């Protein structure tokens, strides 16, 4: 995904007010820079798709069939949006809970989950049982999540506790995620690291002037960014 494409889709997201947080397209761009998608026409699960901007990219630019799945955005709302974008024949809107996804095992070439996985995937068995099982042998899971730069062990700064609220236990470090999603007989490779797109993705969110973005920016102005980061998780499933 080139810088020009990234800017093109960011312009779409600004115009239609579809951003719901840090720019998922910028995070996706970094994830894809570490791998090659390969052939056109892949079957992709966009898990926690929100308003479907990443689904739009895969449908229009990669010719993929995308199952855009979200718990908080209705399938009807997303379907109407996809019709407006002219991609309703390539994106299937699904309303579902990540704990009980209605898909067959070994079904997807690629699973993408950006800024959502930390809400439901922090138990050690979840990835192996609920996520990896859906991916075809040789396929990939691409995950980007907000996290912590260091582990505080119950002594989080007040600023962090105020921003995270009751969800503070969902924000983990790179090392904690390595313990949760480690290598297994079912994986060929697992890469977990801090992302470089942190500042840019957040700034795009602040630039929308959304009321929630303005609240987040106030926390950043107080120094929140010294504690949090974005973490990438790239897993390739074993061929057999």
How would you label these PLM feature ranges?
Residues 124-140:
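A short glycine-rich, Lys/Arg-flanked "PGG" loop and its adjoining helix->strand segment in the class I
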Residues 191-240:
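Conserved Class I S-adenosyl-L-methionine
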Residues 9-24:
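Class I SAM-dependent methyltransferase Rossmann-like catalytic core
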